[in-house]
Amino acid sequence: MKTAKGKDKVKTTKEALKPVDDRKVGKRKAPAEKPTKRETRKEKKAKKDPNKPKRAPSAFFVFLEDFRVTFKKENPNVKAVSAVGKAGGQKWKSMSQAEKAPYEEKAAKRKAEYEKQMDAYNKNLEEGSDESEKSRSEINDEDEASGEEELLEKEAAGDDEEEEEEEDDDDDDDEEED
């Protein structure tokens, strides 16, 4: 089929042969609702476990710990972290293997400690998964029940001990104010 050239020419394309209702002239699709990049990052990023052991530093970072102290003594006016890092990197590159050896030994010891801590941490996670079979509400109910029993036992033992403790606490407060 022929295509139209110019404004006044008749269109003989497939679009021209379709009825007007079927044409997508002037119609736009609504933009798809996609989550923003920030939202997807937040969803993908897993929450960090505060009980997980911190990863062992490399030999360079062990060196950098010592280097920071000496660099700050020699250059008290330089406060930029990047300057300390750059100077430390240059010094590390210029050091021989013999000079790096003590830092590599410290890093190896820390790595061994980290691996032991991770083994213990992973064992605790495995043991913790057994407890997850119970619902958390049942666990909380058991804790609350045992706490109530302890309170009842204390009250039965006598209120004299609690009163003495409160008096001792009041005396401590008076000393802090002076």
Swiss-Prot record:
UniProt keyword annotation of Protein biosynthesis present: no
Upregulating conditions: Down-regulated by salt stress.
GO process terms (BP): chromatin organization
Annotated positions of the Phosphoserine modification: S137, S146
Any one cellular-component term (Gene Ontology): chromatin
Pfam families cross-referenced by the UniProt entry: HMG_box (PF00505)
Entry's localization field: Nucleus
SMART domains xref list: HMG (SM00398)
Region feature (Disordered): 1-59, 75-178
Keyword Transmembrane helix annotated: no
Keywords linked to the UniProt accession: DNA-binding, Nucleus, Phosphoprotein
Compositionally biased region (Basic and acidic residues): 1-52, 101-118
GO molecular function: chromatin binding; DNA binding; DNA-binding transcription factor activity; structural constituent of chromatin
Biased composition (Acidic residues): 140-178
Disruption-associated phenotype: Slightly delayed and reduced germination rate. Reduced root length. Enhanced sensitivity to methyl methanesulfonate (MMS).
Tissue specificity of this protein: Expressed in cotyledons, roots, stems, leaves and flowers (excluding pedicels).
Record-annotated DNA-binding residue ranges: 53-122
Superkingdom of the source species: Eukaryota
Gene3D superfamilies given in the database record: High mobility group box domain (1.10.30.10)
Function per UniProt: Binds preferentially double-stranded DNA. Modulates general plant growth and stress tolerance. Confers sensitivity to salt and genotoxic (methyl methanesulfonate, MMS) stresses.
PANTHER family: HIGH MOBILITY GROUP B PROTEIN 1 (PTHR46261:SF1), HIGH MOBILITY GROUP B PROTEIN 4-RELATED (PTHR46261)
Record family assignment: Belongs to the HMGB family.
Name this polypeptide is given: High mobility group B protein 1
Organism of origin: Arabidopsis thaliana
Upper lineage: Eukaryota, Viridiplantae, Streptophyta, Embryophyta, Tracheophyta
